[in-house]
Amino acid sequence: MPKLRSATSTEGRNMAGARALWRATGVKENDFGKPIIAIANSFTQFVPGHVHLKDMGSLVAGAIEEAGGIAKEFNTIAVDDGIAMGHGGMLYSLPSRELISDSVEYMVNAHCADALVCISNCDKITPGMMMAALRLNIPVIFVSGGPMEAGKTKLSDKIIKLDLVDAMVAGADDRVSDEDSEQIERSACPTCGSCSGMFTANSMNCLTEALGLSLPGNGSMLATHADRRELFLEAGRRIMDLTTRYYKHDDESALPRNIANFNAFENAMTLDIAMGGSSNTVLHLLAAAQEGEVDFTMEDIDRLSRLVPHLCKVAPSTPEYHMEDVHRAGGVMGILGELDRAGLIHNDAYHVAGASLKEVLAKWDIAQSSDEAVHRFFSAGPAGIPTTKAFSQACRWDSVDNDRVGGCIRKREFAFSQEGGLAVLSGNIAVDGCIVKTAGVDEDNHTFIGSARVYESQDDAVAGILGGEVVAGDVVVIRYEGPKGGPGMQEMLYPTSYLKSRGLGKACALITDGRFSGGTSGLSIGHVSPEAAAGGTIGLVETGDRIEIDIPARSIKLAISDIELAARRSAMEARGKQAWKPVGRVREVSLALKAYALLATSADKGAVRDTSKLED
């Protein structure tokens, strides 16, 4: 029978000092011997997705203590990718994932916690905590802050839905008046919560449901809705159940590595492809899999991308649907239910909400469940009132959206497309693969041949786009922005937004060893691996080169001869210490970022640390 980890610091005369300190935190005499549950919160006033989380730890703690545990809360950092975007701050976003992961490990192991509740929400916080949870392999449950309500405003006598990307595009589009741009800006992000489309934060929170690590509704229930309160309370109760199962009954199925196993990662990626999730999820799932010692790779993602249809289309891929609409249609459980009926998921996977995913779907999939409480749960809707407060409204749709033919979530035979929402491309320019969010690409652009317009940084690319250098038919190449080369693998939302603002969103392609915001749409191909700084072919592309992209064939090719490519590689290597470095780029890189770059791997490995460099 596993012994409580916390006994290390609470039992025995030699731990008198530790117990004295525990007492100073509020632990009572009769508390010693109870499991200590760590609550990793990520409250910050910098991020709208986290601004309302301050009191969430107390909610979870109360439920834990009622169930017989000791709850101890700590905080992690949280970077807002939208605020950090478009300047040097974005260099810190992806590296913060590793910092969050390490900080959770440090706190949990330093204090010998027995189990963990992760209160996350935005882009790097959920994956960072997930990496830590799988590294630690103690009972865990995730509960996020929830999505933001979609923005709404009236323009040209028409009510339209909005999100962050609309504000960015309008702000860069000279055709939009100052008045309209300001109106869009003021309306785009009306409430607390993670940005309202299927961007990275919401994608990752949805994937925790498919991995079996969070409760139904975690990814879709609005941050503002009163019903979300119960998710936090239930998370506290469930973590105590998982803790009891493991420590008192030696039930290893309660551990995250047995829940989030290979089949669960396949389920998560299948969901991601079906809902057209952010391409960043690929990066984070690969990283989490490595922490959990799960052999899940780009090859598995490529295989699944050829099998899974696109069942749910959400902003930024369409202006019609946002996360509030996904929730009304049954949320993640609704999508998983359709995938299950299509025979595309492993329904025997363990899940924190029940014995198996099949059991969970029987209750929570509105297409098969007649439970009135479940239908009421998914009827929770927006209020349309600006607020930074959680649980501030209790509005409901008149009915759930159970239309699986023409609704937000569809049956396989009525899918938005039989091709899924994400695809892996490979070729001589990306030998180890790259990622495109096909959900956001017009079908007319699934094959594209263009002339390379090469930039050594995102800043130069932005200047080139806004300065008129980029024209229809160009393939914008932004390199040396990978995990090592940036360092930090910046998101390229501004270049893609500016292409749209110049009317080039469907007339150009963009490829990069950097990554894209979940808000990106258009023919935007990221995660090119190996990256330029690691000797990847993208570092050898020259302006004017012909680049051929074929999504149906899963191909991306630099159309030069092998002889010419070899000659360019030799010339690059001859540059000595300056080889595989951006020519003429001036960028201030802090010591912290340099340390990150030393161990960073390319995107096909999840941009995790190269641990071989740490071996004796």
Swiss-Prot record:
Record's catalysed reaction(s): (2R)-2,3-dihydroxy-3-methylbutanoate = 3-methyl-2-oxobutanoate + H2O; (2R,3R)-2,3-dihydroxy-3-methylpentanoate = (S)-3-methyl-2-oxopentanoate + H2O
UniProt entry tagged with the keyword Magnesium: yes
Superkingdom, natural source: Bacteria
Active site: 517
BP GO terms, sorted: isoleucine biosynthetic process; L-valine biosynthetic process
Pfam families for the chain: ILV_EDD_C, ILVD_EDD_N
Pathways per UniProt: Amino-acid biosynthesis; L-isoleucine biosynthesis; L-isoleucine from 2-oxobutanoate: step 3/4; Amino-acid biosynthesis; L-valine biosynthesis; L-valine from pyruvate: step 3/4
Protein name: Dihydroxy-acid dehydratase
Species this protein is from: Shewanella sediminis (strain HAW-EB3)
